[in-house]
Amino acid sequence: MKYVKFLPRKSLMSKNTLTVTVAGENSLIAYLSTKTDPMIAAKIQRMTEALRVNLKSCLIDLIPSYASILVIYNPLLTDHFAVSKSIYAAAQLADKADEGAFDTAGGALVKLPVYYDVESGPDLAGLAVNAGLTVEQVIAIHQSVEYRVYAIGFAPGFAYLGEVDERIAASRLATPRQKVPKGAVAIADRQTAVYPAVSPGGWNLIGLCPTLMFDPNKEPSMPVKTGDRVVFEAISREEFIDLGGQLNDVEGQQ
């Protein structure tokens, strides 16, 4: 990876270049790429782990995303210059791992059960028709992929997973739902996710997951983190209910 000097304001990125820019009085953003890629995601994970160790008590928060890391630190204990040095050091560690047999399958493997059905996924049938597939084929394709957690947001526990097989990729709904149920498994373009709470949303709903994706009373509060791998496993209606799932909040097809 090529390295550029620390820049105090936003700058252009080039392929395979690490750029560090100021995000606020006590925060920096490290950009590794402009695209989504499993190798980049693995490097983000390694850098995040290294920064947690290197910055220790100076660190307030680390927010990794698809191809960047936001580093928020205590300005009473350190400064932009010291933190930027730590970022470059973390990147070099990631590169050393890359020179060997770099593990793009790093992170925990998390299995999430899903009740796939037109009852639990009101957009499942329409997605299948648009893709020229059967409902059964859509389900099989969706659960055949090992997804990477690329980012967490827009709500706590909302994990952006990629990449969905292009055969079942689907555009967002023209009119978003006012109410998407907690646990809804959804697709938007080549991303998939599980809604952690009831909220508005414009993704295509294909099933329901009974696993709680965010619980502030538990440690950790989420079953997944950035860099983890996720596989979905189909379960029956009865299994879904036995695991605590509920069906009464699902709105109809758009």
What is each of the regions a protein language model found here?
Residues 2-8, 12-254:
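Glycine-rich active-site loops that engage anionic ligands at enzyme catalytic sites
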